[in-house]
Structures are given as C-alpha cells and as structure tokens.
Curated annotation (Swiss-Prot):
Protein name: Xylose isomerase
Organism, scientific name: Burkholderia vietnamiensis (strain G4 / LMG 22486) (Burkholderia cepacia (strain R1808))
Cofactor(s) needed for function: Mg(2+)
Keywords annotated in UniProt: Carbohydrate metabolism, Cytoplasm, Isomerase, Magnesium, Metal-binding, Xylose metabolism
Membership in a protein family: Belongs to the xylose isomerase family.
Keyword Transport among record annotations: no
EC number(s) reported in the record: 5.3.1.5
Annotated coiled-coil segments of the chain: none
Cofactor binding comment, as recorded: Binds 2 magnesium ions per subunit.
Keyword Ribonucleoprotein in record: no
GO annotations of cellular component type: cytoplasm
Subunit text: Homotetramer.
Superkingdom: Bacteria
One GO process term, biological-process aspect: D-xylose metabolic process
Length: 440
C-alpha cells in the first residue's frame, strides 16, 4: 500500500523551478569544500512529529487523519506507520531518520509487552532500512510521556521508575546498535523540578549521573561505537531542567567525570528558550569539546514555548554552519528535523512542503557559510584581535611564568598603560551579510 502515491519523488530542479514539490537549492551531489551537500548535511527526518503527532494541542484534539493512526491492532498500525515513514524518507531522498522507542512500537501494558513489541518492530525497521537504504542517525527512549514519569525518570523519587527507565534505555540502545545507529540521544524532558519545596537537588543530580554512568557502561559492554548525546533544554515540560544549556551540561559532565563519554545534541528552539542564539550554543559546544549533532527547527519569537517549526532563516543557519564547517563538520551527527507542520496543515503534501523548504534553507545556509570559511576574514580578524597573547609576554602569563604578585610588579615596573582597540563589530557583520547576500 502506498500512503503518498500522488506525490512524486522529490528531485533537484534548480532555483528557476516553480514546482513546490522539488528542491530549488538542495542538489545532494553538488560539491562544496570537498564534500557533497548530502555528505555535509546528513539530513534526518524524525518519527515523532512527522508520523506520531496527531495534530493536538493543549486546547484541542488532533486534526490529522492518518491511516496508521486509526483504531486497530497496535502492532499492525506500527507496521503501517513504518511503511509510511520509509515511503516518505525515500521520496524525500533523505539518508537518515530518528526515533523514540515508543514512536515505533506500542508500549503495551507492562515491561514484557513493551520489550516484545519493540523487538518485533526493530526487526521490521531493519527490513525497511535494508530495502530502502535509509539509515538510523540516532535512537532514543521516551522517558517523559507516560504518567509514571511525571516526576522524572532517572531523577524520580521512586527507584522502580528508575528501573523501568533503565529497561527502556537498555533496549533502545541495543536497538540503535543493532540498526546501525550512529548516535544515541538522552533527553531529560522531566529530569528537573516543578517546585523546590519537594525537591532534593543534590540527590536528583546524583541519581541522574548514576543513570548516565550505567548507560556509558552498557554502551561499551555491547560494543556500540556511536556517540552518546544529551539534548539540552532549559524548561518545558518541567519548570527547570538539569540539562539547561550546553554550558550547564558540560559542567554536569565534568562534575561526574563523564566529559569524555557524552556530547550534546543541540536543538535550535531549545537554545532560544534558554536565552541564547543557536549560534551561541553551537560555538560553545565546540569551545567545550562536546559538539555532537543538531536538531534543526525554530521557535516563534513571540511565543515563550517550544513550537518546533521548520527552520526558514538562512541568516541564522549560516552562522551555525560557519561554526560547524570551520571545526571540520559533522562526524557521527547530522541535521535532524525535530520540526512539525502546523496544526492546520492537514494535507499529506504539507509534510513534504515543510521538509522540502527546510532542506533548501539548509543548503543555502551551508553554501553561504562555505563562502565565509573559504576566505575566512572573520577568523583572520579574530586572530589579529588576540595576537598579543601569542607573543612571548602573553604565552608566559598562560604557561604559569608569572604569579599574581610578579605580574603586578612587572606591570608597575613597565608602566603598563594599555589603549583600547576597536572590536570592529560592524565590519564583521558586514562581512557576514556580504557572504549571505552577494550575487554569485
């Protein structure tokens, strides 16, 4: 059965085409900085927003009518959903996908049913991957939707909930390994608090760290060579989450000795919820040595919640890709569309329009970022700004050649009187705009 039989495979037709079901800027075979656009972007489609979400919100029921979401045998519906998903991936021509365990398999009424259902669906996903050539970018476990996780999973006051969560992650990590996934993501959606009045912060942080340590141990035990990634988010659904932003996650990992085992999966909308730009979070991840992968989306600047809209800003993404490209690009990570069509976008075509437009935006932004990297005037000016630290005096300070007292004595003896030098922000912004908007 075809779920999108009236929609053709999406092809590159170029910027002059007016076909809404074609790529206008994403030519997967086009080479930029020595790699194809497909190799640079490593695009993935997420299961949850695309095939699981029924179009509901806090004020209304679902608006979508999807064949695989209708009443029926849960496993049969899960197989229908997988068939629809892989037909969609194949028609888009995207190389990767991502999932939560309960996106792809019915949870059942107990752990035994969960593990049996999930095992059957992992077999089926493996068949679909082999038939289509689509690969798994990352898997994860849903430890936030069921009422048992209302007070968290790893940070729950009930150790039985911790044990249930551990069971899900064990099987989700095993499945990711079996399906050839390149990463495993840990998102602590409810690893936080709603009120400090009933929360033991130290205990919950210790529990979270113990859980992560167990995941690390299991990764090595089964021989999974992919990356473990935490996805930072400051709040929502909880008031405050322990993986608030990249810097917070890094500090947590260092505190518990996990900094060499776990990196970050950065979502654009989560960055803005934390009061940061997407650019900031990516640059910070590289500076701290924990960059892993990206969830591509955007929020609405007028709304203070996670709207998960498709990315549409070449300007924002150019700066994000500038950081990624100048640090060598993705290794195991990629650009996963953690984005959903709007609740009123009920046509099957809308799923394609959202992804096609966003993929074109990624391609445009990557090419503009490549212009910045090829003749990296930003880097040259940045190096010039810090050049004195590379001189003998600067190196002596950083290498421990001075104490606080001896440095103060030296400054007094030399009569140090430094003069401020321009930061040239306006010039730098002009360089970025020239790369984005110059006709080429």
């Amino acid at each position: 059965m075809s779920y999108f039989e009236h929609i053709p495979a999406i092809r590159y037709e170029g910027p002059q085409s007016d076909n809404p079901l074609a790529y206008h800027h994403y030519d997967p075979a086009k080479r930029v900085l020595g790699k194809t656009l497909a190799e640079h972007l490593r695009i993935a489609v997420c299961y949850w927003h695309t095939f699981v979400w029924p179009g509901h919100d806090m004020f209304g029921q679902g608006t979508f009518v999807r064949p695989w979401q209708q009443p029926g045998d849960p496993l049969e519906r899960a197989r229908m959903k997988a068939d629809a998903a892989f037909e969609f991936f194949s028609k888009l021509g995207t190389p990767f996908y991502t999932f939560h365990d309960t996106d792809v398999a019915p949870e059942g009424d107990n752990l035994r049913e969960y593990t049996a259902n999930f095992a059957r669906m992992v077999d089926y996903l493996g068949e679909r991957q082999q038939a289509s050539g689509v690969r798994l970018l990352w898997g994860t476990a849903n430890l936030f939707s069921h009422p048992r996780f209302a007070a968290g999973a790893a940070t729950n006051p009930n150790p039985d909930v911790f044990a249930w969560a551990a069971t899900q992650v064990r099987h989700a990590l095993d499945a990711t390994h079996r399906l050839g996934g390149e990463n495993y993501v840990l998102w602590g959606g409810r690893e936080g608090y709603e009120t400090l009045l009933n929360t033991d912060l130290k205990r919950e942080r210790d529990q979270f760290a113990r859980f992560l340590s167990m995941v690390v141990e299991h990764k090595h035990r089964i021989g999974f060579n992919g990356a473990l990634l935490i996805e930072p988010k400051p709040q929502e659904p909880t008031k405050h989450q322990y993986d608030y932003d990249v810097a917070t996650v890094h500090g947590f990992l260092v505190q518990y000795g996990l900094q060499d085992e776990i990196r970050v999966n950065i979502e654009a909308n989560h960055a803005t919820l934390a009061g940061h730009s997407f650019h900031h979070e990516i640059a910070n991840a590289f500076a701290l040595g924990v960059f892993g992968s990206v969830d591509a989306n955007r929020g609405d600047p007028q709304n203070g919640w996670d709207t998960d809209q498709f990315p549409n800003s070449v300007e924002e993404l150019t700066l994000a890709f500038y950081e990624i490209l100048r640090h060598g690009g993705f290794t195991t990570g990629g650009m996963n569309f953690d984005a959903k069509v709007r609740r009123q976008s009920v046509a099957a075509e809308d799923l394609f329009y959202g992804h096609v437009g966003a993929i074109d935006v990624l391609a445009l932004a990557l090419e503009r970022a490549a212009v910045l990297v090829e003749n990296d005037r930003l880097d040259a000016l940045r190096r010039q700004r810090y050049a004195q630290w590379d001189d003998a005096f600067g190196r002596k300070i950083l290498s421990g050649g001075y104490t606080l007292q001896s440095l103060a004595d030296d400054a007094l003896a030399r009569g140090v009187n430094p003069q401020h030098v321009s930061g040239a922000q306006e010039r730098l912004e002009n360089i970025v705009n020239q790369a984005i908007y110059a006709l080429r």
